[in-house]
Curated annotation (Swiss-Prot):
Feedback inhibited by histidine. Its main location: cytoplasm. Coiled coil: none annotated. Its EC number is 2.4.2.17. InterPro entries: ATP-PRT_HisG_long, ATP_PRibTrfase_cat, ATP_PRibTrfase_CS, ATP_PRibTrfase_HisG, HisG_C, N-reg_PII-like_a/b, N-reg_PII/ATP_PRibTrfase_C. It comes from Haemophilus influenzae (strain ATCC 51907 / DSM 11121 / KW20 / Rd). This is ATP phosphoribosyltransferase. Keywords: Amino-acid biosynthesis, ATP-binding, Cytoplasm, Glycosyltransferase, Histidine biosynthesis, Magnesium, Metal-binding, Nucleotide-binding, Transferase. Catalyzes the condensation of ATP and 5-phosphoribose 1-diphosphate to form N'-(5'-phosphoribosyl)-ATP (PR-ATP). Has a crucial role in the pathway because the rate of histidine biosynthesis seems to be controlled primarily by regulation of HisG enzymatic activity.
Length: 303
């Protein structure tokens, strides 16, 4: 039976309690071999096989928990992290943390948008206009960098309705596909910030056992991300075309070359390629003389 008593020597990790980022974090931990007892009704979860404790909180609470040293690690969108950091610095508060790694999920962009019928050439068209946003500090920094004065209107939700409701002339909000903007009669005109999820650590040094566990997790995360970006490729190649075929497949290391039974003119080539393999690449391999081309996904990888 798993011991779920809170222990001071557990590595404490703060994650978003619900939403797409929460799901992606759960998948990442599973891929890293961390077995978590998830319970949607509980805000604290525990690992079965490692001394890890998960705190499930609001996403905008995670930076503060890291800044204040309440938790050891956190996974958060860079947009939320940057907004909270700018807010604290604006209040003359000290902000310290370590950004360990950008992750390969949580992609989004913070963009300016206006009514689809508005004439827009550049950000200076928004001079002295009211802009609704949930990210006032990121917006202010961008506008200051471009030397544009504006009026900020803070909204914590439903930012897209601000122009049609007469609340603001423009908005600054997160965009993924742009479908929500289009549904509300808006058009995206400028991207002010691009974001992914990232892994952060509190600034204060961890005790050696916790730091060793962090290092282990980092190694596993790196392996998971490299595996997602790589493919294991097997093919047959004429010996005289090896150099040309190898050049089409940039790999982690040199390819493995194996002899083929009863065939002295060709060899089998195995390689882990870091580039995404598209149909065009496979067609180029075939044109170069390769045959029996097999492309396989990689679940885990460690150099």
């Amino acid at each position: 039976m798993t011991n779920t008593t809170m222990q001071p020597n557990r590595l404490r990790i703060a994650l978003q309690k619900k939403g797409r980022l929460s799901q992606d974090c759960a998948i990442l931990l599973k891929q890293c071999g961390v077995k978590i007892n998830w319970n949607e009704q509980r805000l604290i979860a525990y690992a079965e096989n490692l001394p890890i404790e998960i705190l499930r909180v609001r996403d905008d609470d995670i930076p503060g928990l890291i800044f204040d040293g309440v938790v050891d690690l956190g996974i958060i969108g860079e947009n939320v992290l940057e907004e909270e950091e700018l807010g604290r610095r604006a209040a003359n508060e000290t902000v310290t943390y370590k950004k360990l790694r950008q992750l390969d999920f949580g992609d989004c962009r913070l963009s300016l948008a206006v009514d689809r019928d508005c004439h827009y050439e550049n950000v200076k068209d928004l001079a002295n206009r009211r802009i609704a946003t949930s990210y006032p500090h990121l917006l202010k920094r961008y506008m200051n960098e471009n030397g544009v004065s504006f009026k900020s209107c803070l909204l914590n939700g439903s930012v897209e309705v601000a122009p049609s409701a007469g609340i603001a002339y423009a908005i600054c909000d997160l965009v993924s596909s742009g479908a929500t903007l289009e549904a509300n009669g808006l058009k995206e005109v400028d991207v002010i910030y691009r974001s992914k999820a990232c892994l952060i650590q509190r600034a204060e040094p961890l005790e050696s056992t916790k730091q060793a566990l962090v290092d282990k997790l980092l190694t596993r995360i790196q392996g998971v991300q490299q595996a997602a970006e790589s493919k294991y490729i097997m093919l047959h190649a004429p010996k005289e075309k090896l150099e040309k075929i190898t050049a089409l497949l940039p790999g982690v290391e040199n390819p493995t070359i194996l002899p083929l039974a009863s065939d002295t003119t060709r060899v089998a080539m195995h390689v882990v390629s870091q580039e995404n393999l598209f149909w065009e690449t496979m067609e180029q391999l075939k044109e170069a003389g390769a045959s029996s081309i097999l492309v396989l996904p990689i679940e885990k990888m460690m150099e």
